[in-house]
Amino acid sequence: MKKKLTSIAIILSILVFSGVLKAEVKLPAIFGDHMVLQQKTDAAIWGKAAPNKSVKVTCSWDKKSYSTKSDKEGNWKLKVKTPSAGGPFKITISDGKAITLNNVLIGEVWVCSGQSNMQMTMSGYRNQPVLGSNKAILSSTNKSISLFTVKREKSLEPLDDFSGEWQQCNPENVANFSAAAYYFGRMIQESLGVPVGLINSSWGGTRIEPWISENGFKNFDWVKLPDKKQEGEFSPQTPTVLFNAMIGPMVGYAIRGGLWYQGESNRNEPSQYEKLMPGLIENWRSEWGTGDFSFYYCQIAPFDYGTGGVNSAFLREAQLKASTSIPGIGMACLMDVGEKTNIHPADKEAAGVRLAYLALAKTYGKKGFEYSGPVLKEMTIEGSMVKLTFDHAKYGLTTFGKELVNFKIAGENKRFYPAKAIITREGISLSSLQVEKPVTVRYAFENFVVGELFNTEGFPASSFRTDDWEIK
């Protein structure tokens, strides 16, 4: 009898102990030590607990506690009020058994996504370096920057979580973090003097469609959505599958904005991309449900794609047009850093810094500096002469000593000829002996060129055209 009672006691102890383990709060990967929460907002925190269990969250910055109850499946979610930038703080979460998140910072959070040019780390790719990265890595230790890289994953169904962890900003971690994102974050942190959290969720070679949720395709009927019940392997190019696995699990995490560097894999469909780019932004904003957060992206850099396919200048044009299609967005131009035989420009600092200029001006309201390259304002034709004026050229235009060689003009016969281009006080004057009656202008409208037109602040002009002739 005594033996039987002892056995029952052991079984009960095991049941009680396992019940405690089961009751322990579980958090998604996005919540952890060294994380950054968006400042001055109602920041969502969520996770798993035992079903119908009370969960309490206590924040060290104001000692305030927030409570909620998990549903019948153990899911819970609440919001905490975050103060102005600061830290480090602690967050304690308990459903009877407490866990503590340490070194929590309050500041500015940005999600960074795209294909290989966003994925490219500070260490670069094999035989493809990042310019000046070794020195930047050496001096990268900064307690006010935290880094999170989402592990690559794809899914036909929305997932609740992904793999990754918040890391402190030091040489070992920066070497393996997105270069464009790091240079952006470093400049934001230095300029604002607040903590910055960077979440990199990118996958090389991918199109834009995988990064949009199913709800985002309602207006894009040319995109075929996948069968969620299909068996076997599927491509990371499949619409929705990267949003489901690499963006969706963090939807709701409070952020200031998004960064995007992608487009090379969509270069043959510029007309569709012009719609899909703002479509992705509106989709993410809708999924987050926190208003029109800022979103800035890089225009693809010039590269020699060869003779097949559509001239990638049309994709750059689509990106330029998209940049004014909806509020709260902007485009960083990279016309001066492209490499003829390398689709991954080494100058990733240019990408990150130009994105940061956009954010500092348009999101944070900083004044007294330029944040964009020259943008065509008006074209006038006087006989055989074409005159162009530009916005974002307050102090004029320059080539920094180079010759203007990338302008072409055409008449009604649609034959383009190199134009003699002269920078004037008002803008640029163009002419060609082969074109007596010009009707249109194109600048740097090729797969690969090295852009030579800048404003005096050093920002390059995008390739552009003034015609709407057939894309080919």
Where are these regions (language model features)?
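Bacterial N-terminal signal peptides that target proteins for export
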Residues: 1-9
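Sec/Tat signal peptide C-region and signal peptidase I cleavage site
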Residues: 19-23
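Bacterial N-terminal signal peptides
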Residues: 9-18
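Cell-envelope and extracellular/periplasmic
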Residues: 24-472
